[in-house]
Amino acid sequence: MYLPMSESYNGQRTWDVKKFKFQFQTMDIKSAAKYKELKRSDVLIKEEIEVYPDTTVWIRDFAYSYNEPMHNDYFWHEAYSDYPVVGVSWEQAQAFAQWRTIYKNGYQKSKNKDFVNKYRLPSEAEWEYAARGGLQGATYPWGGPYTKNDRGCFMANFKPLRGDYAADQALYTVEADAYEPNDYNLYNMAGNVSEWVLASYDPSSYEYTSTMNPDVNDVDN
């Protein structure tokens, strides 16, 4: 990470971002509930994760493209302030939710307000519900089955043709609000970048998961 002179620390302007770690702990609530004889320390999971995203993704994921400008500018230049974050692992997304909970509850405590329960990633079922925007049986968040509107413009940023990332006029990512939101006023529920959820996706999950607990990773299902 390279800092401008005005933000340097003791004259040092470069930092190895891999050394910035966030330490946090979570509780295995299911084990705690199932095995009541366990001690609190037995169900606490301590983890350490890198704070910053992988800033080399533009080079690694597109090895044969000229992506040096994206690599150099995407994570710090103000021109990309409204663009989605990339290069974040599932573990980092989990850690951010944990940090956000701590940060929010610190503020709540300073104002003598009630704590928030917990920030977390949505389950796959929750994400799908949000992505549908209230529509039933729709292929896309805007309904479908077409990917273009009546003016011939694509409704989301994705690769519409084989080997062609530019057909939708967006070679890379675009601003988060570049396309219309769905009926829940949520943006980018299709296209632009992939999004992490709490549980993995299984196309057969409707056949064996409980509607009360649609978590495909839960062994109780």
Model-derived features with residue positions:
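Functional-site microenvironments in short loops/helix caps that host divalent-cation chemistry
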Residues: 14, 33-221
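Non-catalytic, alpha-helical, charged scaffold/linker segments
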Residues: 1-32
